[in-house]
Amino acid sequence: VKRSKIGFGFVALAAAGALALSGCASGGGSNGGGDAGAGIITVNNTEPQKGLIPADTTEVGGGKVVDALWEGLVYYDADGVTQMGVAESIESDDNITWTVNLRDDAVFSDGTPVLAHNFVDAWNYAANIDNAMGNQYFFSAIKGFSETEPVEALEGLKVIDDHTFTIEATPDFPDRLGYSAYYPLPDVAFEDMEAFGQSPIGNGLYKLDGEGAWKHDESISLVKNDTYVGPREVSNEGIDFKVYASLDAAYTDLLAGNLDVLDQIPDTSFAVFEDELGDRAINQAGALTTTLAISTSLPHFGMDEEGKLRRAALSMAVDREEIIDVIFEGTNVPAVDFTSPVVDGFADDLAGKEKLEFNLDEAKKLWAEADAISPFEGTVEVATNSDGPHQVWIEAVANQWATNLGISAAPKLYPTFAAFLDDREADVVGGPFRAGWQGDYPGAYNYMQPLYYTGASSNHGFYANPAFDAKLDEAINAASHEERNEKLNEAQEILLEDMPSIPLWYQGTTGGYSEGVDNVVFGWNSVPIFNEITKN
């Protein structure tokens, strides 16, 4: 008897859940940029690092836009429940081979139908190493995937008919299907993928507002997609994503009524935003984690005895509680692991978690032991981007390291998030760097595989440990949910031994909205559910 693994009400985590944005559509007006027109909501954003290709978008500036332009097989609602999107059903009788049946009324915004081959072609393209997609690793669970050799067509994907295809993959694979890497692509995308990324055609709740809708470093203007037919509805006429050089500037615009929704409060306003915004302030639990990653190629910080001693010393020299109380006004929670408390399987008793606790004497001792192996000279520079809300706490961490370890430590600031990411990917940052993570889909695996698996695209510390990789592989092939969580926790204990990054805190979701909008709800991943927002 077939049983549906993915269906209405399936929850992938303990208390969370929405990554895709939502809506149903009727015709939208025109708003080619600049001031938003009637019914258009304005939202803060950062400039996307790359073109708007779902399988190549790995940061939130592009991710928010991609999720508004597309709809996947499923989506996660604001409470973490998996709901059907383009899929009518996803069924398996063995947890290995999945049959996907699509709705027959789904279309792209250019009017072409969304068919089974649009998913299969998009996935094959993303999985092929020759295409260098940032989310390639999300297809590693499908039979036939290769990390090293180009594969034109995955053995585990088969088109049955226009509205049916099958997937042969690991048992946990369906949990991820709401993530943007799995969105379909229209045939036209493959004619010139780079050009497509600048003017994408999706099948979601919104579409680009005509030619020139993406004004680089300024704004991205979307309107309701009048071709969308699906389970969700849009309560506004569109979204104007406004690119800001700093969150302070965005917050000032919010207070002045020049911005409708701000999805992150700057650290300089934590003490006052709830008083200034009143019941329009958002302060809730989230699934964002903040860490400091350290490249394994950085002298004195490699994956040898000296490097592990220094990594542990830096971690134990940070007084997380003090920074959270003074800078974040208590809105964050000190980290005790590498995932998030809102995901299923979270454990706060992992072996090695003492490395995440403030212990000044032990930190000094470990640093001295490392110096006995190879003396450290120079300055520990801790890096972040200055167009985000991080400069103040980065300075606090540097000051604590200097005071507590008696070393030279200082911030290193990049002007933009894109420039910061470029240097991380090129392995030229030259010191510890901020490496926060927002869940792509509701699951603990997603907080480890993209960041720490050998060769993963967001593994900007270039960590490689075959034992850790093997534990993750065991987890995704586990026969039961309980066994999967057990293997994931064992993998975390390897991370706590090696410390490829320094977990700092679980970031609360703080935001706000203007008097010009209503029905503002933030999902589990701290992204507003844009389609539900109404313009007054």
Where are these regions (language model features)?
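Ligand-site clamp/hinge motif
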Residues: 194-195, 200, 227-272, 287
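Structural transition elements
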Residues: 333-370, 387-392
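N-terminal lobe/hinge region of extracytoplasmic solute-binding protein
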Residues: 44-94, 201
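Long beta-strand-rich cores associated with HINT superfamily self-processing modules
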Residues: 511-536
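Surface-exposed binding/hinge segments that line
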Residues: 91, 134-189
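Extracytoplasmic/peripheral linker and loop segments enriched in polar/acidic and small residues
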Residues: 324, 408-420, 446-514, 536
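Alpha-helical secondary-structure segments
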Residues: 115-124, 162-168, 205, 236-238, ...
